[in-house]
Amino acid sequence: MARKSNKTAMAFAMQAQTDVFVIPSASLDLYPVSNLNFSIAGITVENPEYTGSIHKNGPDVVGKTISGSFNINMRPPGGDDVPVANAYIPGRVLKAAKFTETIVSAPIPAAAEAIGGAGNTTTAVTLGATAGTAVDLYKGMALLLPTIIGPARDKITAIRSYSAAKLAALMETLDLAASGTYQIPKQVSYQRSISESDAPLLSVSQWLDGMRYDLVNFRISGLRWVMPVSTRDGATTPTFEVTYTATINSYGDEATPAIPAKGATPSFKDGKLFVAGKAVGGSNLTVDFGLRTAYAPDPNYADGSGAGELVESTTTINMDRQAYLKAQFYTLAMAEGQAYYPVYAQWGYTGGKLVQVVVPDARFNYQSPTLGQDFITETGDMYVDVFDRNVCINFPYFLA
C-alpha cells in the first residue's frame, strides 16, 4: 500500500552534548506539527578525469545534507497550572532558537497588593511594597491589573520596562490610570536571550508512515512567528514556522505513533494589538528572527563539517496594518525619528490558554500605503535591536 502523508509524527528531546543522540519518547515527547518538508540532498563533486571520448563520468557523491521545515500551532500549554521546566514541547524548539524559559510558579506577590502611590498613569504603574527593585526584573512579563475594565482576560497586560523605583512601563495604553492592586500572575515565558552561550541542540525522531529517522544535532536554522488575524471572512491559525538542519543518526522501519489531541488553538481575535501605545487594526503580524547557521570544517565528521551553529540573528517585525490619519498614528514621523516603540499582541480567553507576544522596543522603517482592496493599509518592517528580552512570548495563568 502507498505510504500516507498524514501518518507523520515528530518527537523532540533536548540534546545535552554534541553528537550524542538522546532518544525521544514515542509517547511523552510527541507534539503535532504540520507542513513538514524533509530533504536529503547529496553533496557532489565533479569528476574532471578524461575518458578518451566526448562523454564524462558523473559526479562523485561525497556526502549528504539534511534539512527541512515544519509548522507548530501557537497553542498555549493549557491545563490548570503552569508546566514544569522543559515540559512544554514547543518551548524546546524556542530554547533551541536562543530563548530562555522562565517559569513563575507562584504569583508575585502571593496575594494581590496595593500599587504604589506615585507615577501611576495610563501607560505606567508603580508596583507595591513587596516588589523587587532590580532594573528590568519583570521586563517582558505578564501583569494583572484587576481595575482594568472588561473581562478577566482584558485585565492581563504586560511590562515594557521596569525601574529600580518599581515603575513598570506598560505595553499598552489603558483607558484609565492604573489604580487598586496588582499581581504578576503565574506564567511560563520564553524570552529572547542575547547571552554569549550557544543555543542548545535537539534530538528528534521523525516518522514518515512506517519509517523512523533519528536526527542528531538538530539545529533550528530559521524561526518565524506568523500571527494572522481571524475575521468573519476567514480564519487562519497562528503558527511557529521552523526550519532546521540535522544529521541522520539512524533510521529504520517503525510504525508511526499516534499523537494525542491537544485541543483547539486560540485564534488571533477578540484580543489586543498595540503598536506605539495605540490599539491598531490589521490583518497580520509576523516576527522573523533572521537566524543564520554555519558549519565549521571538520574532517572528523562524515560530511566534513561539524554540527550546525547559530552565528547570526537579526529580528524584524512585519505587519499589514490599517492606515491612519496623521493626527491618529503617523508612521512617517516615527520612521524619521527612529525612536523605539513597543509592539504588543494578546489573544485567548482563559488562564493557560492565552498568548502574549511582547516586543518592548522596535524602530519603524518607512511604511507604504497599499490601495486596491476595500481599505487603505500600510505594510512595512520594524527593526528589533539587541536588547536582552527584546522579544518574549508569555502564557499566563489566572482566574477567570
Residue ranges and their predicted role:
Residues 1-400:
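Signature of extracytoplasmic/envelope-associated structural regions
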